[in-house]
Amino acid sequence: MASLYVGDLHPEVTEAMLYEKFSPAGPILSIRICRDKITRRSLGYAYVNYQQPVDAKRALETLNFDVIKGRPVRIMWSQRDPSLRKSGVGNVFIKNLGKTIDNKALYNIFSAFGNILSCKVACDEKGPKGYGFVHFQKQESAERAIDVMNGMFLNYRKIFVGRFKSHKEREAERGAWARQSTSADVKDFEEDTDEEATLR
């Protein structure tokens, strides 16, 4: 069995619509749209399970970013192990993206560096927010993407590409920077002033 995650679904997409879209790639074992337990409304993503990995791979390669009910869907291999998902290995953070860069454009740009497990541009109700994430299958692909793409111009904007850092890592860095900054300020203050001048 091979499982695909299908995201960015329109709320009215049904299992039957997904079956119609995904069955040409090969025999399907099951399709499940994830729904709110109380309201039964779609949460905007689903899992499509194929009998054969080769069929799932074909669907991923041919249907990613296809439009269903007016929205391009984002397909990736289902990663059920949360520790692997959150480990940060192979994850790249990209910022200062132009408004024209969507999931498909980001995928097309970064797929040159290796196999992509997932790719997403952050959006709100107004559209793309100017940053995104790419999760590569291999750490080497992520490192190559960072080396080549960091500081490059994309649609006249200089982009930042770096290793994805978890919230905990970012907080630890901020704390270290604040401690270093504060001690440096006090040290500089002490060197530049004398006690009498300070009291006046």
UniProtKB/Swiss-Prot annotation:
Pfam families: RRM_1 (PF00076). One of its GO terms (cellular component) is nucleus. Residues 188-200 have a biased composition (Acidic residues). Keywords: Repeat, RNA-binding. One of its GO terms (molecular function) is poly(A) binding. Transmembrane segments: none annotated. Residues 170-200 are annotated as: Disordered. Residues 2-80, 90-166 form the RRM domain. SUPFAM superfamilies: RNA-binding domain, RBD. InterPro entries: Nucleotide-bd_a/b_plait_sf, PABP_RRM1, RBD_domain_sf, RRM2_I_PABPs, RRM_dom. The keyword Repeat applies. May be not functional as it lacks the poly(A)-binding protein C-terminal (PABC) domain implicated in the mRNA stability and translation regulation. This is Polyadenylate-binding protein 1-like 2. The gene is PABPC1L2A.
